[in-house]
Amino acid sequence: MRFRMFSRVSIWVAVVIVASSCSKFRRISKSEDWRVRYEAALNYYAKQDYYRASMLFEDIMPIVRGLPEGEKVEFYLGYCQFYEKTYLLASNQFKTFYETYGRSSLAEEAHFMYAFSLYSSAPSANLDQSDGIEAMDAMQNFLNKYPDSKFQERAAEVIRVSQGKLEEKGFQNARQYLTLRMYQAAIISFDNFRKNFPDSKYLEEIAYLKVVSQFNLAEKSLVTLQPKRYRAVIDLYQELVDSYPESKYLRDAEKMYSLSLAKVTEKKEVKS
C-alpha cells in the first residue's frame, strides 16, 4: 500500500517538474529580450539539453548575426545538431561557420567537425558509400589546411576507417558478380579492386576467387573457347602460388588447376 502511494506521489512530482520545465521554456522562448534567450540557450547547452538549446539558438541567430554573440550561437548550434544526431544539418552548420568566421579561433574546430559530421552520417560498409567518400575528401582537405592540428590523429583515423569501408564495399561488389555467376564481370571487378586497393587485406582471397571465376567461366564456355580459358586458370593458379605460397586456398585451387591442366592436355591430344 505504501509502495503504491509512493509510486503515485513520484509520478505526480515528475509530471509537475516536466510541466514546470515546459512552462519555463515557453516563457523564455517568448521573451522579447534576446539576451534572456541567449543565456538560457547556453544554460540548456551546459546541461546537455541540446534540443531546447538548439531551438533558442536558431530563434536568436538572425538577431545576433554580426554581434560578438553571433559567432558563439552559430558554433554551438552546430554542436547541438551533432549531439542530436542530425549529422547533415550539423555538417552544413559547421561549414557555414568556418566559411563565415574564417579568422575565428573556432574555425579550425568547425572545419574538423564539418568533416566529422559527414563521416558520422555515412552508413555501414554494406550500403552506399557516397557520404563516406565525401567525408574522406573533406577530412583530407582539413589536414591539408591544418597539418599540425590538435585534431590530426582523429582526422587520420576517420580517413583510415572510411577507406576501410570503401575497401569492404568494393570487395563485396566484386564478389557479388561471382555469386551471380557473371564470371567475366567478376574477373574484371577483381582486377579493378586490386588497382584501387593495392594494399588490401583481401588480395589473397581475390587471387583465389579469380581462379574460381576463371575456372567456372571455362566450364561454361563454348568448346572452341575452352582451351584458352583453361590455360588462363593455370596461369592464375601459378600467380596465386607465387604470391601466396602458404595460402589456405591452395588445396581447393589446386583441384581446379589439375582439372584445367587435364582439359588442356586432352584438347592437345585430340588435335594431334
What kind of region is each of these model predictions?
Residues 2-6, 18-272:
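Acidic, polar-rich low-complexity tracts and alpha-helical solenoid repeat scaffolds
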Residues 9-17:
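Sec-dependent N-terminal signal peptides
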